[in-house]
Amino acid sequence: HLDYAHLNWSEVRELCGSPLVEIGNHTYDLHEFKGKDGRKGANIKKGEAFADYKKVLTDDVTKLQEKMNEHLYQSSRVFAYPYGFYSDESEKILKGLGFDITLTCDEGVNLITKDKECLYGLKRYNRPYRAETEAFFKNIGIE
């Protein structure tokens, strides 16, 4: 988010050199929350035709994939939904674009199996800035 955190391409490229870091796609420009009937992040709008939505999401995500190829010499296999808003439609489109993993903002623990489908719609916990590791995990029930 431009108001509180960002990296430049050089910094991201440096991170790509680590086997511990995976750089993901978070859309190029679908980070708005436009009220009750508007678009919420990368999600389909109420009443929007699937074909129209598919074009919007595909064009946007592809633009960032192309930028990643240009600056990082690789694209992403991972997609994190802005604001965590997702739908069956978005999952279908992203699978079609070659993403292997999607991350929501739903809180919870994931059960990872040998079935690749379990990597779509993954839950996660948002760790607040400055939260102590031990206290954070204790708070979510992991000790």
Segments (PLM) and residue ranges:
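Active-site glycine- and acidic-residue-rich loops that bind
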Residues: H1-W9
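C-terminal active-site subregion of NodB/CE4 polysaccharide deacetylases
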Residues: E14-S18, E22, Y28-E143
